[in-house]
Design a protein with these regions (language model features):
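Pyridoxal 5′-phosphate
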Residues: 1-153
């Protein structure tokens, strides 16, 4: 038996009082439709940027890419051997480049358990960095990131 979330009249539904907010419902439906229309194009753009970043990062001897090739192109996880992730984060922050350490699900751990499961290497899982991309990311930003990263290794 469900209890009402908001008490009041039950002319529309027994679970919520009041009239459904039609303008909000219509606005949400339109926003969802627009997002779904642009999603395939945005996905391909982000995939292209991710591929460029991968191609450039594998050229650097001290870097290991942890994200699998078929993983989401919106997140690229990599490790830099011999450099603490916090040190690199601070160097990059000084250049207005922002990364995260480890993985979102292991931010309080000494190492990333999910990266360890992927790599079976504890050192790599301790030094992982997470680069997030979005539909608003650009190839120019990716090129600038690679340049800044190389200058800070």
């Amino acid at each position: 038996n469900l209890s009402p979330l908001i008490n009041g009249g039950d002319s529309q539904t027994i679970y919520r009082a009041g009239t459904p907010p039609l303008p909000l419902i219509a606005s949400f439906a339109k926003a969802l439709r627009l997002a779904l229309e642009e999603q395939p194009k945005a996905y391909l753009k982000v995939k292209e940027i991710n591929n460029y970043l991968r191609d450039e990062l594998i050229k650097i001897d001290s870097i290991t890419i942890n994200s699998k090739i078929d993983s989401s192109p919106y997140i690229l996880n990599f490790s830099i051997k011999g450099i603490k992730p916090e040190t690199m984060i601070h160097k990059l922050e000084a250049k207005d480049v922002y990364l995260s350490t480890k993985t979102a699900c292991s931010s309080k751990e000494d190492y990333s358990k999910s990266i360890y499961e992927l790599t079976k290497d504890k050192e790599i899982s301790k030094t992982s960095l997470r680069l997030s991309l979005s539909k608003d990311s650009t190839m120019e930003e990716a090129k600038e990131f690679i340049k800044i990263l190389k200058n800070n290794l």
